[in-house]
C-alpha cells in the first residue's frame, strides 16, 4: 500500500505493510518506507510518538533537502506503552542543524539508525566549519546504576575547520569573533 501521513502531505509512504503474526498475542507489526522533504520528516519525528521514543533527540533540528525513512513498528494492542520502533533515515546531500546554537552540517551523507532505545551514526559525512567532517556514535540507554557523569549520547566528530568556516559560524560566539583574525585550517577530533 502507499499513502501519506496526516498533516505531512510532502511525505509519501510506500511499501506499507501491516500484519498480526499471532492472533493469541495481538501485536501489530507495521513496516513502511517514506520519502520527502527533510523538514517534514523532522517534524514527523518530533510531533509523533517517535519523538518521545527517541528521547526527542531531534526536537530542535532544522534541515533542507529530501530524505528517506524506513520504519518498523511493533504495536502490542493490549499495552501500546510497550511499543517498539526501529528505523533509519538516509541522507543524501542534505543540510541539517541539530540545535540553533550548533553549526550547520552541509552536504550531509549517511544513515541515522534509530530505535526506542536510542540512535546511532556510522561513517556519516558532511561539510562543517569550512571543511570535511565524519561523525560516528549515538545515544543508548544507560544502566540504572550508571554514574551521573556518564552521558547517554556519545559522538565522535573528526574533521577539519577553516578560519573562514569558523568566521561564518556566528552561533559559536567568541570563537567566531576570534577567527576573524585567523587564517588557515586545523584538524579536530
State each model region's role.
Residues 1, 23-80, 84, 88-92, ...:
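Extended amphipathic, helix-rich lipid-handling scaffolds
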Residues 15, 68-70, 109:
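Membrane-embedded beta-strand positions in outer-membrane beta-barrel channels/transporters
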Residues 25, 105-107:
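Short "repeat-start/strand-capping" segments in structured domains, especially the N-termini
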Amino acid at each position: 500500500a502507499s499513502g501519506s501521513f496526516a498533516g505531512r502531505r510532502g511525505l509519501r509512504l510506500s511499501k506499507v505493510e501491516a500484519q498480526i503474526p499471532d492472533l493469541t498475542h495481538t501485536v501489530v507489526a507495521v513496516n513502511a518506507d517514506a520519502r520527502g522533504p527533510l523538514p517534514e520528516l523532522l517534524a514527523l519525528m518530533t510531533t509523533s510518538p517517535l519523538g518521545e521514543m527517541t528521547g526527542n533527540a531531534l526536537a530542535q533540528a532544522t534541515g533542507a533537502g529530501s530524505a528517506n525513512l524506513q520504519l518498523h513498528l511493533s504495536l502490542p494492542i493490549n499495552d501500546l506503552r510497550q511499543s517498539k520502533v526501529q528505523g533509519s533515515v538516509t541522507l543524501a546531500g542534505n543540510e541539517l542543524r541539530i540545535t540553533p546554537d550548533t553549526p550547520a552540517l552541509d552536504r550531509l551523507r549517511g544513515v541515522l539508525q534509530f530505535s526506542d532505545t536510542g540512535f546511532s551514526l556510522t561513517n556519516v559525512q558532511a561539510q562543517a566549519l569550512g571543511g570535511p567532517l565524519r561523525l560516528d556514535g549515538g545515544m543508548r540507554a544507560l544502566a540504572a546504576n550508571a554514574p551521573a557523569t556518564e552521558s547517554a549520547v556519545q559522538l565522535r566528530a573528526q574533521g577539519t575547520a577553516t578560519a573562514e568556516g569558523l568566521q561564518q559560524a556566528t552561533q559559536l560566539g567568541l570563537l567566531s569573533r576570534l577567527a576573524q583574525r585567523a587564517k588557515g585550517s586545523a584538524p579536530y577530533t
